[in-house]
A protein has these predicted regions:
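Divalent metal-coordination and catalytic microenvironments
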Residues: 46, 106, 151, 187, ...
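Active-site glycine- and acidic-residue-rich loops that bind
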Residues: 83-93, 112-135
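Short acidic/histidine-rich active-site segments
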Residues: 141-163, 187
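Catalytic beta/alpha-barrel core
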Residues: 52-59, 80-88
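Active-site gating/metal-coordination segments in enzymes
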Residues: 1-52, 105, 111
Length: 201
């Protein structure tokens, strides 16, 4: 915890470069004791500094409430907590809405990823499934808690190596959202307002 607080500029002595986000804190489907220890330290550091937390969830599991319970116990503000990899649980409407009701951000960050995950025996949700789920979340009143991202984590995901690169959401997914009736004002909330809220309040 002390090291995290130092890196975030919350100690007396300051590092040359300040971190502005805690994470992505990794949680596996086994949710090991070491992972819980790391998560608790992140929660304490966030409580001490006000810096937001981003948590890697194993998307096909349902560990979001356990994660939020731990962060809450450590004093973290759930309104500055981002739960990553929410795409695979898109059809579990109750789960996602309950997490949003607790204040957390739901990050749909597997957009444009048409991968088969052998360890999960599961296919990534399609862009159409993602768009419909996001539209339903908006219709249910959760627009201010949705984040969009691509989770670019492989070399082959860069345009230079044949991937979608970093512009896929703007070039391809935003037009799809428009086709689902999402307005320009709503898109501004998703693309600009919500990222600001993660950091600002």
């Amino acid at each position: 915890t002390e090291r995290l607080i130092y890196d975030l500029g919350g100690a007396e002595e300051k590092p040359e470069v300040l971190a502005g986000l805690i994470g992505e804190i990794g949680i596996s489907s086994r949710f090991t004791p070491d992972e819980e220890k790391s998560l608790r330290a992140a929660g304490r550091a966030s409580a001490a500094t006000g810096v937001p937390i981003e948590v890697h969830l194993p998307g096909w599991e349902r560990l979001g409430h356990r994660v939020l319970d731990i962060l809450e116990q450590e004093g973290a503000n759930l309104r500055h907590t981002v739960l990553c990899h929410m795409n695979p649980s898109f059809a579990d409407k109750r789960y996602q809405r309950e997490l949003a009701q607790r204040g957390a951000f739901l990050e749909y960050d597997m957009i444009g990823m048409s991968y088969y995950y052998a360890d999960e025996s599961a296919q990534s949700p399609s862009d159409e499934e993602n768009a419909r789920a996001i539209r339903e979340l908006i219709d249910d009143g959760y627009i201010q808690q949705i984040l969009l991202s691509q989770d670019v984590f492989l070399k082959t995901m860069l345009t230079r190596y044949g991937g979608h690169g970093y512009g896929y959401i703007l070039k391809h997914f935003v037009p799809r959202l428009r086709r689902h009736g999402i307005s320009g004002e709503q898109l501004e909330t998703l693309m600009i307002g919500n990222p600001q809220r993660v950091f600002g309040g």
